[in-house]
């Protein structure tokens, strides 16, 4: 059975691992390199802090039989700049990504779905769709349009987002590559 619960700072390691997995870091490809371990450790600390992009306060966990199996990180896009300023200076792994000159991923009026990831053993079972629908519901409750970025070279993710009703709104350069910006307006 799938249930959801708000994350807590005690979930920081799970959050960090799955944020990095969403960014295609291969966090389930063992053995982990020193770079991946360092990024995981640094991001874990960021996830414990309030008012960061990946803070536990912005995260929802999907549980399967009571165990964490998936992650959603989403927040009011009007706070993106504040959260970004509190996040990237703490992460050496992003030092070469020009985050200071990167355009904002989100803005006022958006409920930004920053990260969505499912542990490998739970993929293909509808958990990602359940998390995405939870995010869309939260956006509606907040009276904001739901937005996200997706790697255009990720056809399964593009199909999932399209099937839920997300529409392509253009492209955005972030973290050294182009992403598609998708949204649902209510």
Identify what each model region corresponds to.
Residues 1-10, 30, 186:
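Conserved N-terminal entry element of GNAT/NAT acetyltransferase domains
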Residues 61, 67-76, 112, 117:
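Conserved beta-strand in the GNAT
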Residues 118, 124-137, 159-163:
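Conserved acetyl-CoA-binding loop-helix of GNAT-fold acetyltransferases
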Residues 36-59, 63-64:
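Active-site rim helix/loop that mediates acceptor-substrate recognition in acyltransferases
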Residues 77-79, 147-150, 162, 167-181:
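Conserved catalytic-core motifs of GNAT/GCN5-like acyltransferases
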Residues 109-111, 123, 139-151:
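Conserved GNAT acetyl-CoA-binding A-motif
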Residues 24-47, 92-95:
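Conserved GNAT-fold acetyl-CoA-binding loop/helix
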Residues 76-111, 115:
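Conserved acyl-donor/pantetheine-binding loop and adjacent beta-alpha core of acyl/acetyltransferases
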């Amino acid at each position: 059975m799938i249930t959801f619960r708000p994350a807590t700072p005690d979930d920081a390691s799970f959050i960090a691992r799955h944020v990095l997995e969403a960014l295609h870091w291969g966090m389930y490809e063992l053995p982990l390199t020193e770079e991946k371990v360092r990024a995981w450790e640094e991001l874990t600390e960021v996830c414990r802090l309030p008012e960061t992009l990946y803070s536990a306060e912005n995260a929802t966990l999907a549980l399967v039989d009571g165990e964490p199996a998936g992650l959603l990180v989403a927040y009011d896009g009007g706070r993106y700049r504040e959260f970004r300023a509190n996040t990237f200076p703490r992460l050496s792994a992003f030092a070469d990504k020009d985050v200071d000159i990167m355009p904002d991923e989100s803005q006022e009026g958006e409920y930004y779905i920053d990260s969505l990831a499912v542990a490998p053993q739970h993929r293909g079972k509808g958990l990602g769709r359940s998390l995405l629908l939870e995010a869309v519901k939260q956006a509606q409750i907040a009276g904001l349009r739901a937005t996200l970025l997706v790697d255009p070279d990720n056809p399964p993710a593009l199909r999932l987002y399209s099937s839920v009703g997300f529409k392509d709104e253009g492209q955005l350069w972030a973290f050294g590559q182009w992403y598609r910006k998708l949204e649902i307006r209510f």
